[in-house]
């Protein structure tokens, strides 16, 4: 179907809208038919793909890291062990320390990386920036007194901020790096968790087993821990350079994250597979530095203006910090109000970016109006108008009509993470850049000299995989995402709880996995600004743990805490009552946000109910936080079962 790319301007008719919806469905069907042709490999579970998981940033001789690791491992029993040393893990640690009931010495952070930062440790590709305003994304700016250098900070600056937080709260010496947790097992007799895994040696080899004991483990390993690598036919026949964007090889490309002048590509034919939020930042850099660049695209990104600029210290002090103590949280709440499409919006849009001008993203993350039966019908015309502007922008910036047509996104704006960049689309005007549209046939196979797509062999010196991260559809629990086996009372595993009718209390703890806490989206709040959601989880867990410790009798040495059955079922009912707020995702083009096009209507009723129990809080992040703060203010720890042992 061919229709105007500018369809749905201000005076769009119902007929035009139906045309656009038909075009959306046509593109969706094309995507559904091409999906599933290539299996995704979890690289940590497949020895043939281990090269894509190795750490390129770990120094060959990190003596200080090794000494610190061995010292902490020798202290086998720790009060709190946090799995993950990104912003999630750091926020849990900081909020626990701020209660006054825990010290840094009570806490250990364990991570497979060789430093702090989580996804910002691993990702160091050229052009990397956050796509949410740094003044609200980078946590604890008030506490650290730090001013980001730009409205959208670079990846390097964000990683350095993680290190800054660790230093301020005396956590730098409380991390066990290059250590992979593989299992958590509850020991009923000792009322502790046994944590087992392996220490990584040089080049991630020489793996040695370890075991730790924790009173209270916290799982904060994040959703983007493992690079996603499609198992293309004959992928290992390829003799050129092959790497994933999350393991960028500057030794091959030249340059660095601080200086993306990649002189090593000046005489190279380079391919990048994927055009999501990562690729749109990399493509302009590759276009400037490669002899030839081939961009393999299945689904076009919807790319709006980013408009990054340096932070003006005077303005930052007067307009942003000038709002007084608590300015960062108020700014975050202001952002959330617009992105969740609150019924009554603030009079002042403090951020004023592409996110806050996209109320339709609330279809994905939830909001107060999402629960209204006709909300999708209300928001669809607004989203169609925005997507029309996005499509028009493509044709304004891209000189070739044919290339612009291929770069034009035909799907609702909430179906893919929206992108923001000021150079990506213009890159396709360069004579050395070629777009390869693979939405029909995909990549059929690799060859020794390149790959075959659409029946054409492309000879390539390097192939870069910008294929995202493993987000398991069937292993959606925190343990599944982290590839950790968690076994609680009576042999109950976390995976079983998520698969067979999840119930939690507030999305941070679940019965039969006592003393264990976690971060995630199931039965918790969701928002664009991930660090805000993580912080709310951390604040809540810190409250629960500190209040429980306060109530522990002086003659008791052990505390066991878990939700009551009634408490977690009551919370789950609150989730189910709001699950319909996410119904708009079902008709999207396939991707990780909708289980790669999974048809829920084909499932049995009990399977559909189990899926609904996995949903986030559908009324928006503000409502979720209000529910948690109201619960805390009552001071009863309602729905929590505490048992004390001498």
Swiss-Prot record:
Predominant place of localization: membrane
Keywords: FAD, Flavoprotein, Glycoprotein, Membrane, Monooxygenase, NADP, Oxidoreductase, Transmembrane, Transmembrane helix
Sugar attachment sites: 46, 429, 483, 529
Annotated residues for binding of FAD: 119-122, 131-132, 137
Site (Transition state stabilizer): 417
One Pfam family, short name: FMO-like
Pathways involved: Secondary metabolite biosynthesis; terpenoid biosynthesis
Keyword set includes Oxidoreductase: yes
GO cellular component: membrane
InterPro entries, alphabetized: FAD-binding_Monooxygenases (IPR050775), FAD/NAD-bd_sf (IPR036188), Flavin_mOase-like (IPR020946)
Residues that bind NADP(+): 129-131, 275-281, 298-299
Membrane-related topology note: Single-pass membrane protein
Record field: catalytic activity: preaustinoid A + AH2 + O2 = preaustinoid A1 + A + H2O
TM annotation in the entry: 80-97
EC number: 1.14.13.-
Domain of life: Eukaryota
Needed cofactors: FAD
Free-text comment on the cofactor: Binds 1 FAD per subunit.
Compartments, as annotated in UniProt: Membrane
Any single GO BP term: paraherquonin biosynthetic process
Family from the record: Belongs to the FAD-binding monooxygenase family.
Role, per record: FAD-binding monooxygenase; part of the gene cluster that mediates the biosynthesis of paraherquonin, a meroterpenoid with a unique, highly congested hexacyclic molecular architecture. The first step of the pathway is the synthesis of 3,5-dimethylorsellinic acid (DMOA) by the polyketide synthase prhL.
Annotated protein name in UniProt: FAD-binding monooxygenase prhK
Organism, scientific name: Penicillium brasilianum
Name of the gene encoding the protein in the UniProt record: prhK
């Amino acid at each position: 179907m061919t229709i105007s790319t500018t369809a749905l301007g201000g005076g769009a008719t119902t007929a035009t809208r139906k045309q656009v919806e038909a075009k959306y469905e046509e593109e969706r069907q094309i995507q559904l038919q091409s999906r599933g042709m290539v299996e995704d490999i979890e690289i940590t579970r497949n020895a043939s793909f281990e090269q894509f998981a190795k750490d390129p940033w770990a120094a060959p001789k990190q003596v200080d890291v090794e000494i610190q690791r061995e010292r902490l491992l020798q202290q086998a029993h720790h009060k709190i062990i946090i799995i993950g040393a990104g912003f999630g893990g750091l926020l849990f640690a900081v909020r626990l320390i701020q209660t006054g009931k825990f010290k840094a010495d009570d806490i250990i952070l364990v991570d497979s990386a060789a430093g702090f930062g989580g996804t910002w440790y691993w990702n160091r590709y050229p052009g990397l920036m956050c796509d949410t305003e740094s003044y609200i994304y980078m946590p604890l700016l008030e506490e650290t007194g730090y001013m980001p250098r730009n409205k959208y900070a670079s990846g390097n600056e964000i990683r350095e901020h993680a290190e800054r937080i660790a230093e301020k709260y005396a956590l730098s010496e409380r991390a066990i790096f290059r250590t992979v947790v593989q299992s958590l097992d509850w020991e009923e007799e000792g009322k502790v968790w046994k944590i087992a895994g392996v220490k990584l040696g040089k080049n991630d080899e020489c793996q040695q087993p370890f075991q730790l004991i924790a009173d209270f483990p916290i799982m904060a390993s994040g959703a983007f821990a493992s690079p996603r690598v499609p198992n293309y036919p004959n992928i290992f026949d390829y003799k050129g350079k092959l790497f994933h964007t999350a393991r960028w090889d500057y030794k091959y490309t030249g340059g660095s994250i601080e200086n993306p002048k990649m002189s090593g590509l000046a005489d190279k034919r380079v391919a990048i597979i994927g055009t999501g939020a990562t690729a749109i930042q990399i493509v302009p850099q590759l276009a400037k530095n490669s002899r030839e660049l081939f961009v393999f695209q299945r689904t076009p990104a919807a790319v709006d203006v980013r408009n990054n600029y340096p932070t003006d210290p005077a303005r930052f002090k007067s307009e942003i910090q000038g709002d007084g103590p608590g300015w960062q949280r108020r700014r975050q709440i202001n952002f959330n109000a617009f992105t969740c499409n609150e019924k009554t919006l603030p009079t002042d849009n403090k951020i004023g970016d592409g996110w806050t001008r996209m109320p339709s993203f609330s279809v994905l993350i939830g909001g107060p109006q999402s629960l209204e039966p006709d909300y999708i019908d209300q928001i669809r015309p607004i989203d169609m108008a925005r997507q029309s502007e996005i499509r028009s922008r493509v044709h304004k910036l891209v000189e070739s009509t044919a290339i612009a047509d291929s770069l034009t996104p035909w799907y609702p704006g909430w179906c893919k993470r929206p992108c923001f960049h000021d150079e990506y689309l213009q890159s396709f005007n360069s004579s050395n850049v070629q777009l390869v549209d693979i939405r029909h046939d995909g990549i059929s196979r690799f060859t020794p000299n390149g790959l075959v797509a659409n029946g054409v062999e492309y000879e390539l010196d390097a192939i870069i995989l910008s294929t995202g991260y493993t987000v398991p559809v069937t292993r959606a629990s925190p343990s599944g995402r982290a590839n950790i086996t968690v076994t609680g009372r009576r042999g109950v595993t976390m995976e079983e709880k998520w698969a067979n009718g999840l119930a939690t209390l507030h999305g941070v703890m679940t019965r039969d996995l006592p003393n264990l806490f976690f971060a995630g989206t199931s039965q918790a709040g969701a928002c664009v600004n991930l660090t805000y959601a993580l912080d709310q989880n951390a604040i809540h867990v810190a409250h629960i743990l500190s209040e429980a410790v306060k109530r522990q009798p002086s003659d008791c040495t052990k505390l066991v805490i878990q939700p009551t059955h009634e408490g977690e079922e009551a919370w789950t009912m609150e989730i189910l009552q709001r699950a319909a707020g996410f119904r708009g995702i079902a008709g999207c083009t396939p991707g990780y946000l909708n289980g790669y096009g999974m048809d829920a209507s084909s499932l049995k009723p009990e399977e559909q109910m189990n899926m609904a129990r996995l949903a986030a809080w559908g009324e928006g992040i503000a409502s979720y936080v209000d529910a948690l703060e109201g619960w805390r203010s009552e001071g009863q720890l309602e729905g929590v079962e505490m048992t004390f042992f001498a």
